[in-house]
Amino acid sequence: MLEFHHMFHSYNDNPSVSDVSFSVSEGEVVTLLGPSGCGKTTLLRLAAGLERPREGEIWLDGKLVSDAGMVVAPETRGIGFMFQDYALFPNKTVRQNIAFGKGAGDHRERVEQLIAMAGIRGLEQRFPHEISGGQQQRVALVRALATQPTLLLLDEPLSHLDPELKESVRNELQKLFRETNTTALFVSHDIEDAMAMADRMVVMRDGKAEQIGTTDEVYDQPANRHVARLFGKTNFIPAGLLAEAENSFEGENGEGRVVQVWPHQWRIVEQTDGDSPVFTGKIKSVTNRGAHREVTLETEQLTLTIHLTGNVALKAGDSLSVSGDLSA
């Protein structure tokens, strides 16, 4: 459906995208994930035809639409857009906003289906300021999907929503994508959005793709420390201390290969626990995080972050032995 081949782009001789290649299959939702300035929005603009690549090619539905010498105009690509601020016209009603999309008037039956599926029936005659942020978001999505675009591009579609509303709208978006078999590429810096909505993710850093894979692959087998840290606090253990670990990656500053162990993958054990490597040390701190206790354990080899659930009667200064359960 959408293919990037060795994309390079720069602004004022400053590289913004460096040798990025990936594809989005029909009916697939892919997220470009990373911090501000990593190149993800540039890739979205390249896909839209709003920028021309310095090198590389973009193919859409089997046709070359961009390379260093040409760019097919955005309005002829059959692409739908959903902007960060939704870009609704304040002086138009919900129905008028939806109908404003090019060719939307030719898809009345689809528009009615989308209105029902998105749960905005009854809001058609209201103006944007008369509906909630979540409802505005759904109106913008219906407008983007009304013309049956080949591809939907979304730029941080959930960034303006409060946490409670965000989760609800995220679930609705995911459901609507599946029901309409939407092919989508969306930009996000939020790992929860990416994990919940995407089939695959492209993790970006400094203009390069650090890792491309399914959400499970990226979570279970991060390519490096940067990717692993996207998911929150974690532990990096020298591979030699966890000989049974199957997945490791090259560490930083010449430290050799390391294994990532999530805080929840530790279990309390006796100092001798068969063949499993045991780490023993003194507890530096215990913090109540609500659903779990976060324990900082200083061992002879390294400092560990451990999440324990249940009735944890531990305090700073206590001795503790733990073993990593990488299957947890």
What is each model feature region?
Residues 54-57, 206:
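Conserved coupling/switch loops of ABC nucleotide-binding domains, chiefly the family-specific signature
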Residues 48:
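Helix-to-loop junction immediately C-terminal to a conserved catalytic motif
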Residues 234, 245-328:
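Non-catalytic connector elements of ABC transporters
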Residues 74, 78-80, 84, 88-226:
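ABC ATPase nucleotide-binding domains
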Residues 41-44, 139:
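ABC ATPase nucleotide-binding domain helices that frame the ATP-binding cleft
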Residues 57-77:
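ABC ATPase NBD Q-loop/coupling interface
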Residues 33-35:
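The feature captures the beta-strand-to-loop junction immediately N-terminal to the Walker
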